[in-house]
From Swiss-Prot:
Residues where N6,N6,N6-trimethyllysine is found: 5, 10, 28, 37
Protein name, as recorded: Histone H3-like 1
PROSITE patterns named among the record's database cross-references: HISTONE_H3_2
Chief location of this protein within or outside the cell: nucleus
Biased composition (Basic residues): 1-13
Residues found modified as N6,N6-dimethyllysine: 5, 10, 28, 37
Biological function: Core component of nucleosome. Nucleosomes wrap and compact DNA into chromatin, limiting DNA accessibility to the cellular machineries which require DNA as a template. Histones thereby play a central role in transcription regulation, DNA repair, DNA replication and chromosomal stability. DNA accessibility is regulated via a complex set of post-translational modifications of histones, also called histone code, and nucleosome remodeling.
Disulfide bridge partners, by residue number: none
Length: 136
């Protein structure tokens, strides 16, 4: 490259523009030290719809077995102490309880949709139970 003659310029009290360009270039070319990649986030509702499809396909129990068994034993103790349960009896109770809850949530969802909402609320559960004549 050929050298060119530089003419004198009057300073206006600011920083030299060459320094600014140098720092910008340094920032662009320098590797980012905090290069932690953000985890991928799905749009709201996508994961919920995927879970709905997953659980509608499956037939396994949704509640854990041991916590449900402890709950059954705790409730049964109010009526009679030293009761014993066959494992199949607890499983039958759990199947019935989950079937009841799934049906209740289906009716609750219909009540929310009827109210032009997509979010279920306690008043939807109360209405569904009232229509079923479970609670007057």
């Amino acid at each position: 490259m050929a050298r060119t003659k530089q003419s004198a310029r009057k300073s206006h009290g600011g920083k030299a523009p060459t320094k600014q360009l140098a720092t910008k270039a340094a920032r662009k070319s320098a590797p980012t030290t905090g290069g932690v990649k953000k985890p991928h986030r799905f749009r709201p509702g996508t994961v919920a719809l995927r879970e709905i499809r997953k659980y509608q396909k499956s037939t396994e129990l949704l509640n854990r077995k041991l916590p449900f068994q402890r709950l059954v034993r705790e409730i049964a103790q109010d009526f009679k102490t030293d009761l014993r349960f066959q494992s199949h009896a607890v499983l039958a109770l759990q199947e019935a309880a989950e079937a009841y809850l799934v049906g209740l949530f289906e009716d609750t969802n219909l009540c929310a949709i009827h109210a032009k909402r997509v979010t279920i609320m306690p008043k939807d559960v109360q209405l569904a139970r009232r229509i079923r004549a479970e609670r007057a």
